[in-house]
């Protein structure tokens, strides 16, 4: 059953308040002045101001879910084609015009800021678009639905044309930290992988096989708020990044080699 939701009034904020938020995040969250800010830094300041609103609504949504003790839906997918989030979130919040006014008061256009945002390279096919639509629809309808996937480091590829031929380059879409992703390190998962089974006996002479030379894969989750159009409901998309590994046994050089290979599950390019 969908949880009852309220619509968000678009007049909850004014351009002055929003501009103060943007200035705060640019100066203190990012650590630069406007005069020294890159286009991406400006985008990030705007995005953090929007995320502030999203997280307030997200906490209210979670409290509503807890009080109603409603069942939850978890959607697992290898791909989530969510596109660019700044304009989508502003439209869903009914705050686009106010943010555009704040941007003009600062001497810039919101459309220029929005075009700085890279597409979230979390897939390359219909599977990812379908998954993103499901999350958006569930949030719009007030359904407690959450997505789980992989936080890929690279996209499909970045195209260059050299001497009339296509050259494929790595798509480092996460070269800069995403302002939409909130690291949830307290929920990290430690997964033992690889290794071998060695026969053995315990002190009583009973057969006791041991798992040897295994490695630990650390999955660190990052949550992205997912808001439905015009709704108060904000769910999340949880994406896991392979952070590091450690070898349970063996020389230090072997552990270092394993550690270098650690990000492979999330660094794989989507083809």
Where would I find each of the regions flagged by the language model?
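A conserved ligand/cofactor-binding region detector
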Residues: 1-271
């Amino acid at each position: 059953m969908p949880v009852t939701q309220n619509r968000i009034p678009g007049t909850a904020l004014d351009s002055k308040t929003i501009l103060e938020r943007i200035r705060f995040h640019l100066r203190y969250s990012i650590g630069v002045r406007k005069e020294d800010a890159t286009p991406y830094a400006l985008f990030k300041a705007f995005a953090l101001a929007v995320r502030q609103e999203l997280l307030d609504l997200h906490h209210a949504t979670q409290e509503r879910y807890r009080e109603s003790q409603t069942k939850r839906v978890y959607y697992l997918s290898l791909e989530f084609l969510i596109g660019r989030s700044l304009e989508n979130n502003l439209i869903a919040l009914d705050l686009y015009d106010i943010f555009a006014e704040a941007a003009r008061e600062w001497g810039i256009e919101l459309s220029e800021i929005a075009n700085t945002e890279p597409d979230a390279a979390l897939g390359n096919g219909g599977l990812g678009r379908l998954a993103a639509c499901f999350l958006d629809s569930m949030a719009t309808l007030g359904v407690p639905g959450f997505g789980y996937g992989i936080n890929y480091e690279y996209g499909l590829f970045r195209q260059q044309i050299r001497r009339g031929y296509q050259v494929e380059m790595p798509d480092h879409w996460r070269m800069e930290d995403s302002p939409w992703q909130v690291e949830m390190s307290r929920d990290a998962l430690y997964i033992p992988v690889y290794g071998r089974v060695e026969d053995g006996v315990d002190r009583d002479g009973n057969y006791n096989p041991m798992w040897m030379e295994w490695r630990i894969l650390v999955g660190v989750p990052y949550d992205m708020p997912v808001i439905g159009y015009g709704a108060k409901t904000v769910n999340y998309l949880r994406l896991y990044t392979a952070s590091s590994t450690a070898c349970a046994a063996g020389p230090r050089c072997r552990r270092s080699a394993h550690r270098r290979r650690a990000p492979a599950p999330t660094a794989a390019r989507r083809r």
